[in-house]
UniProtKB/Swiss-Prot annotation:
The keyword S-adenosyl-L-methionine does not apply. Keywords: ATP-binding, NAD, Nucleotide-binding, Nucleotidyltransferase, Pyridine nucleotide biosynthesis, Transferase. Transmembrane segments: none annotated. It comes from Methylacidiphilum infernorum (isolate V4). Belongs to the NadD family. One of its GO terms (biological process) is NAD biosynthetic process. This is Probable nicotinate-nucleotide adenylyltransferase. It is an enzyme of class 2 (transferase). The keyword NAD applies.
Amino acid sequence: MIKKTTSFRLAIFGGSFDPIHYGHLICAMDCLEQISLNKIIFMPCSRSPFKKQNPVASALQRLEMIQLAIKPFKNFEVSSFEVQSPAPSYSIRTVQEFHKLYPHAELFWIIGSDQVPGLPRWKDYAELIQIVKFIVVSRSNYYPYEKRDYLVPLPKIRYVDISSTEIRERVKKELPIFHLLPQAVFQYIKENSIYIPNRTVHEK
C-alpha cells in the first residue's frame, strides 16, 4: 500500500467537466482542506470507459473552461493528459504517468461514493489500488460502502445539487445558468454558443 511518510499530497480530480461548475469547485476545496492536500489536478477525460457518449463540448473547450474556473485557486491545476491520450480514458494510465512525474508524492483520486462499488471493474484495479488512494465524496441516495485501506472518506460533506447535465439541459431550454458556475465560465459558454449552436445563452 501507499507509504504515509511523504509530505507532498497530490489528488487527481477526473471527470468530463462538461461544463465545470460550483459543485466541482466546492468538492475540490473541501478535499484540499480536509485531506491536507498540496495540489489538485483537474483531469478532463476524453471519454469514460463506462459511458457510451462522448462529452458535448470539445476537449479544448472543457480545458479552457476549467482554466477559467480554477484561476483564483493557487492549489488547483488542469492537465490535458487524458484528452490527449487515446480514448477511452483509463485511470491506471493516468495514475502511472503522474506516479512518474511525482515519484515521491502520495497520490489520491477523488471519486463519488456511487463509484465505489464499481471500482473492481476499473482497468488493472489491483495495480491501481497499490499506487493511489481514493478520496470518497458521499452523494445523496447512496448507501455506506465497506471500509478499505485505499478508501479515504471525506469527513464533512457539503452536498451541492448541481450537475453538468442539468446545466446543458437548461441551456437547451433557454433557462438561466449563471448562478450554477463561475462568471468566467458562463461568459465562455455564452460567447462560444456551447451546448446549443446558433442560439443565445440567456442571462436571466
